[in-house]
């Protein structure tokens, strides 16, 4: 079965994550999308009340089950800074994929 790994990460971590993916044998490819959002947090300034959205990147990888743990670990180890807001990773089942 195939899985979709979706990660929301800080923009400056993407290059390190891509480099880590290059070390995974048979890595299937990825999509990187500019996005904005916010998680559970307290507002820290007047600016936050005007525009709570922070820029981030969404990384999507469709992969076989056997590769998912490697992909998730590569993201976790290269996106982690230890600060709140480092991101989140979702792993979901892919019901069907159709090449165009």
What are these regions (language model features)?
Residues 1-100:
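Positively charged, small/polar-rich N-terminal and surface patches that mediate targeting and assembly
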